[in-house]
Amino acid sequence: MTRIKINARRIFSLLIPFFFFTSVHAEQTATPAKPVTVEAKNETFAPQHPDQYLSWKATSEQSERVDALAEDPRLVILWAGYPFSRDYNKPRGHAFAVTDVRETLRTGAPKNAEDGPLPMACWSCKSPDVARLIQKDGEDGYFHGKWARGGPEIVNNLGCADCHNTASPEFAKGKPELTLSRPYAARAMEAIGKPFEKAGRFDQQSMVCGQCHVEYYFDGKNKAVKFPWDDGMKVENMEQYYDKIAFSDWTNSLSKTPMLKAQHPEYETWTAGIHGKNNVTCIDCHMPKVQNAEGKLYTDHKIGNPFDNFAQTCANCHTQDKAALQKVVAERKQSINDLKIKVEDQLVHAHFEAKAALDAGATEAEMKPIQDDIRHAQWRWDLAIASHGIHMHAPEEGLRMLGTAMDKAADARTKLARLLATKGITHEIQIPDISTKEKAQQAIGLNMEQIKAEKQDFIKTVIPQWEEQERKNGLLSQ
């Protein structure tokens, strides 16, 4: 049995989180003041916090683009009819937050401020300019309109003012002064009984990360960001909430099912895991204290893999060596991934079988219970896999969610087999060749050549116009 050291702050678990999880500075006062002014230019704070700034800037080294659709073409089918079927890359460093949302095929190729497929809310986790605009225009003023409206305004990459009260005198003296810069995040924390001002400093550290590393949806006519935590944070609680308000992110173009798309629910899954239950915060593993050249300790803002700073992270509490813990990580990741693929295979078949039933004349009433099962199965699968580090944040919860997703998908397929039989269809429904991303995209009718050409034109013509306005308005340091 693994022996655990007792830390003065709390008992750590036997596991370690593994993937990137946005975090914040470890030192802070218990009740930081609310921001008075939002300065979005990160370079402004380099003289006061040089080590933190340089380590934050080093997130530009995390530059590799990994195409998740190419790795797993099944995703294209599951997200048919949704922008994620066009383009889905794994996360890069914070230094690429603005670039990546501008260049992804998901945001389309708008020609003007009123054009394009997505709302302003899609900027909300990308930049301290979001906090600046909310302060300037209010939430309603910030959220209204299309994503392209924010192009000339959202320019500085995720940074200082997203997590810190940079206007505070204490921050100027070198203190962290954590804050929730997104009012909707503060309301969500209050909804689960965690008002930020009353939280302890370890809770606050993770709550700041939880402004963005959460599940959310776009609410109301203005498409404002809201966290679906009114009924609780477990997958079933959020599913119940979404069903109650009859919300869907999109309708799958094959099965015509009203679907839910999970975002990146690290806060929810971390909370459900042993680290979260013992209040081992995001920064303990992803932003440890390290020494600068003069031997002074500071919080490393190059958010990343705990194994890259093993002595400052895992070894603080675990007695195993690095290789032993890496083996634990690999085994848990493999277990999650194996079940993930099995659930995806069932869902792919369910979507195509539902399409066959509709093509054969199935009615809305006949399809409703089947589509409910597909919706719930894919929601549970998505919430499990959208949190990239769930295999270490909450592996048991991840396997549980995937297990219930498998059950729901099986229920859908059983009902589909019976319904198809009533339409005279007893043979197996053939699935087209989806062995590559390109073939899967072709199977759902995407004209990727046109989509990519339009995006390249947008990058060459519209983004330079935005950048010219940014420089003219003094929104960038350079």
UniProtKB/Swiss-Prot annotation:
Enzyme Commission no: 1.7.2.2
BP GO terms, sorted: anaerobic electron transport chain; nitrate assimilation
Residues binding heme c 2, per UniProt: 160, 163-164, 301
Transmembrane segments: none
InterPro entries: Cyt_c552, Cyt_c_NO2Rdtase_formate-dep, Multihaem_cyt_sf
Leader peptide range in chain numbering: 1-26
Binding site residues for heme c 5: 275, 314, 317-318
A GO molecular function held by the record: nitrite reductase (cytochrome, ammonia-forming) activity
PANTHER family attached to this UniProt entry: CYTOCHROME C-552, CYTOCHROME C-552 RESPIRATORY NITRITE REDUCTASE
HAMAP family: Cytochrom_C552
Annotated protein name in UniProt: Cytochrome c-552
Natural source organism: Escherichia coli O17:K52:H18 (strain UMN026 / ExPEC)
Gene that specifies this protein: nrfA
